From Swiss-Prot:
This is Putative aldehyde dehydrogenase DhaS. It catalyses: an aldehyde + NAD(+) + H2O = a carboxylate + NADH + 2 H(+). InterPro entries: Ald_DH/histidinol_DH, Ald_DH_C, Ald_DH_CS_GLU, Ald_DH_N, Aldehyde_DH_dom, Aldehyde_DH_NAD(P). NAD(+) binds at residues 244-249. It is an enzyme of class 1 (oxidoreductase). It comes from Bacillus subtilis (strain 168).
Length: 495
C-alpha cells in the first residue's frame, strides 16, 4: 500500500485488504472464471486494489438473481413505506461511513478530498433520501372517460434494470440511477466503471447491512466490452441506464433495440459558457474557469467553450490564465489540492493528444498544456486562445482541464454559434440583465442552462441533454418516468 493510502481511516484500511468480490444475490462471491483486474491510484499510477472481474457468466447470474427478486421475491409485494424505510436506512449508513466513502472516491478517481467530502458524498446521500421519499408518492390518475366505464392508470416498475455507471462521479452517478429505480420498485444490476469500482463495492457492504432482500441490488465490476455488453444484450433485462460517451451510448442504443429495451442515456457534451459584456467579471471569470476545471475537467457538462465578447477578449483570457495558474495541483488526499490527476493513463494520453492537436491547428496555449509531475496522471490547467469554431478542440469533448476561449460580437451571433454543436447537454451565461438572460436561455439548445453560476445541482431538479447528449432525464420526479410502465385499467360499470 502506498504512503498516500496510509492516510485513510482504519475502517477503510480494512476494506482495502484482499481481492474484492462481486455482490450477487445478497452474497459476496468471486467471479465464475476467477479472473481479476487491478485498479490504480491515479495520483501515483500504483495498483490500489485487485478485484474479481465480472464476465458474461457473472452477468447472467446477477440478472437471474434480479429477475427472481422482481418476479417472485418479497420486494415485489413489499409496501412502498417499507421500501422507503430500507432506502432511508441505506442513506443513514452512507452518512455514518461518509468519511470512508469520500476517501475511497478520492483514492480511486483522483479528485480532491475537499470535493468528495463536501460535494460528491453529501449529494449522493441526498439523492438516496430524496428518492426514499418518493416511494409512497407514485400515483396514477382516474380519467373521466365516455360511457359506463371506470378508467384509472397505474405506474408499475419496469422490471430488471441494468445500470452502467461512469468513472467521473462514481458513487453520485450510481445514486442518480439507483434511487429512482428502487423508489419505483425495480431490481438492479449495476456495473461500475472498471476505472473506479471501489465505492460501489463499499456501498454493497452497506446495502447488505441495511437489509435489502437478496437479488434486489447486484453490483458487478467488470469491463464494458464484456460485462457491459452482456448486460445490455441480456434478454431478461427490461431497461438499460447508461452514463458515458456518446460513442458508447450509440452502441448501447443499437444493442438494446434488438429486444426493444427501454433506454436512458446521459452522454457527452461540449457546453458553451457565454460571458456578456455587462457580466460581473469578478464572478464570471472564476465561475467560468471553474466550470471547466472542476473535477479536472472530467465532467460531461463542462463549460469548455467559453465565449467572450471581442472588446473584452484579451483582458478576460489573461485573467483566466492567471487564475488557472493559481490552482494548486496534487494528490487528491492532500487537503490543499484544487486540481487532482486525471483518472487513468488512457485519459491522460487522450487529453494530451487533444492539447497537441489544438496547437497544431493554430490555437495558442496561453497557459498549461504540460505534465507538472513525473508520476501520476496530471495535466496542468490549460487555457487556449485564438480558437475558431471548427477547430477540433472547439468541437469534440476533451474531458480534461482544457478551456477554449472564443471571441464573438453580437448576442444573436453567439447564440447561433453556441448551438452549432452535435451536443446539447448544458450551457451557461453571465449577465446582469435579467431580460437578456431569459432571452438567451430560451434560445440555447441545452437540457440545463445556468445563469450567473455553473455546475449547480439538486436532487429535485432534472438533468439531461438535447441532441446527441442523451435520452431522458436523470434526477427529480422526471427520472421516475424512466423506471415505470403506465397501465390503463378499464372497468365496465354496466349492469
Amino acid at each position: 500500500m502506498s504512503s498516500l493510502t496510509m492516510q485513510v481511516t482504519k475502517r477503510l484500511e480494512t476494506f482495502l485488504q484482499g481481492t474484492k468480490k462481486l455482490y450477487i444475490d445478497g452474497k459476496f462471491v468471486p467471479s465464475a472464471s476467477g479472473a481479476t483486474f487491478d485498479t490504480p491510484n491515479p495520483a501515483t499510477g500504483e495498483t490500489l486494489m485487485t478485484l474479481y472481474e465480472a464476465q458474461a457468466a457473472d452477468v447472467d447470474k446477477a440478472v437471474k438473481a434480479a429477475r427472481k427478486a422482481f418476479d417472485q421475491g418479497e420486494w415485489r409485494t413489499m409496501s412502498p413505506a417499507s421500501r422507503s424505510r430500507l432506502m432511508y436506512k441505506l442513506a443513514d449508513l452512507m452518512e455514518e461511513h461518509k468519511t470512508e466513502l469520500a476517501q475511497l472516491e478520492t483514492l480511486d478517481n483522483g479528485k480532491p478530498i475537499n470535493e468528495t467530502t463536501n460535494g460528491d458524498i453529501p449529494l449522493a446521500i441526498e439523492h438516496m433520501r430524496y428518492y426514499a421519499g418518493w416511494c409512497t408518492k407514485i400515483t396514477g390518475q382516474t380519467i373521466p372517460v365516455s360511457g359506463a366505464y371506470f378508467n384509472y392508470t397505474r405506474h408499475e416498475p419496469v422490471g430488471v434494470v441494468g445500470q452502467i455507471i461512469p468513472w467521473n462521479f462514481p458513487l453520485l452517478m450510481a445514486m442518480w440511477k439507483m434511487g429512482a429505480a428502487l423508489a419505483t420498485g425495480c431490481t438492479i444490476v449495476l456495473k461500475p466503471a472498471e476505472q473506479t469500482p471501489l465505492s460501489a463495492l463499499y456501498l454493497a457492504e452497506l446495502i447488505d447491512q441495511a437489509g435489502f432482500p437478496a437479488g434486489v441490488i447486484n453490483i458487478i465490476p467488470g469491463f464494458g466490452e464484456d460485462a457491459g455488453e452482456a448486460l445490455t444484450n441480456h434478454e431478461a433485462v427490461d431497461k438499460i441506464a447508461f452514463t458515458g460517451s456518446t460513442e458508447i451510448g450509440k452502441k448501447i442504443m443499437s444493442t438494446a433495440a434488438k429486444s426493444i429495451k427501454r433506454v436512458t442515456l446521459e452522454l457527452g457534451g461540449k457546453s458553451p459558457n457565454i460571458l456578456l459584456p455587462d457580466a460581473n467579471l469578478k464572478k464570471a471569470i472564476p465561475g467560468a474557469l471553474n466550470g471547466v476545471m472542476f473535477n479536472q475537467g472530467q465532467v460531461c457538462c463542462a463549460g469548455s467553450r467559453v465565449f467572450i465578447h471581442k472588446d473584452q477578449y484579451d483582458e478576460v483570457v489573461d485573467e483566466m490564465a492567471s487564475y488557472a495558474e493559481s490552482l494548486r495541483q496534487g494528490a487528491g488526499l492532500h487537503k490543499d489540492t484544487q486540481i487532482g490527476p486525471l483518472v487513468s493513463k488512457e485519459q491522460h494520453e487522450r487529453v494530451l493528444s487533444y492539447i497537441q492537436k489544438g496547437k497544431d491547428e493554430g490555437a495558442k496555449a496561453v497557459t498549461g498544456g504540460s505534465c507538472p509531475f513525473e508520476a501520476g496522471y496530471f495535466v496542468a490547467p490549460t487555457v487556449f486562445a485564438n480558437v475558431e469554431d471548427e477547430m477540433t478542440i472547439a468541437k469534440e469533448e476533451i474531458f480534461g482541464p482544457v478551456l477554449t476561449a472564443i471571441p464573438y460580437e453580437t448576442v444573436d451571433e453567439v447564440i447561433e454559434r453556441a448551438n452549432h454543436s452535435e451536443y446539447g447537454l448544458a450551457a451557461g451565461l453571465w449577465t446582469e440583465n435579467v431580460k437578456q438572460a431569459h432571452y438567451i436561455a430560451d434560445r440555447l439548445q441545452a437540457g440545463t442552462v445556468w445563469v450567473n453560476c455553473y455546475n449547480v445541482f439538486d436532487a429535485a431538479s432534472p438533468f439531461g441533454g438535447y441532441k446527441q447528449s442523451g435520452l431522458g432525464r436523470e434526477m427529480g420526479s422526471y427520472a421516475l418516468d424512466n423506471y415505470t410502465e403506465v397501465k390503463s385499467v378499464w372497468v365496465n360499470l354496466e349492469d
